[in-house]
């Protein structure tokens, strides 16, 4: 079973079983919480060309909470990290009306990051809090920009989604996908499972094991957990094969 989005590094877990989020402002993994295994694990600030992170899959981006005070400074580093094979997604980036810089600044920072994702052909992990309208505006802009430049629009995945099925339908109609954390709308879970579209499960920053999140979701759906695991597999059509 795959944990689609986590901030907690645990080196006792199979490296290919989770997507570890790293903020581009952090020095490697030093800003992350250790959830088990070896404490104090860290990555170098500048990843060398042959860096593979021991098989761990990464998403790297600038969180909207950290867009104040010159977000542009971090984009060269993000562009470099985005080229690494172990970085399979860009993010989390996005919009949050409750925290961070002004919405205009957050939108500019997100525009820059989704453009990087389009150039390297990798999906985007999106943080969105009470900014659905603005997110839809950016998605529309993004598709137009990609088409005009000959890029393939990449999938955006809304992580930690707590909205209703109607919201999920709107997002999915625009080429986005949904990832559910430990708190979600049960009707949305049922809709995602029955509609046939890909979706994902995640731990984010909670210490509940991903196995428990899958177990609870399978009980609520009334299905065997193996069926759920097969539905939440990002390697089918989202992530590129990792070659190093």
Where are these regions (language model features)?
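Mid-domain alpha/beta scaffold segments of enzyme catalytic cores
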Residues: 1-244
């Amino acid at each position: 079973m795959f944990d689609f989005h986590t901030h907690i590094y645990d080196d006792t877990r199979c490296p290919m079983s989770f997507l570890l989020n790293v903020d581009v402002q952090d020095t490697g993994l030093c800003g992350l919480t250790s959830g088990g295994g070896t404490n104090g694990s860290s990555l170098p600030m500048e990843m060398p060309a042959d860096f593979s992170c021991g098989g761990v899959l990464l998403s790297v981006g600038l969180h909207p909470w950290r867009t104040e005070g010159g977000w542009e400074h971090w984009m060269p580093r993000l562009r470099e990290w985005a080229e690494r094979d172990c970085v399979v997604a860009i993010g989390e980036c996005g919009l949050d009306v409750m925290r961070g810089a002004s919405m205009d600044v957050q939108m500019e920072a997100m525009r820059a990051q989704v453009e990087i994702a389009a150039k390297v052909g990798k999906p985007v992990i999106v943080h969105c809090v009470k900014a659905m309208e603005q997110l839809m505006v950016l998605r529309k802009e993004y598709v137009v920009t990609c088409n005009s430049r000959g890029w393939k629009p990449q999938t955006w995945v809304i992580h930690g989604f707590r909205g209703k099925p109607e919201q999920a339908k709107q997002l999915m109609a625009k080429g986005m996908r949904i990832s559910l954390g430990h708190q979600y709308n049960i009707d949305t879970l049922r809709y995602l499972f029955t509609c046939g579209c890909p979706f994902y499960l995640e731990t984010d920053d909670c210490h509940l094991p991903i196995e428990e999140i899958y177990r609870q979701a399978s009980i609520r759906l009334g299905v065997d957990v193996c069926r759920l695991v097969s539905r939440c597999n990002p390697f089918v059509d989202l992530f590129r094969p990792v070659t190093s």
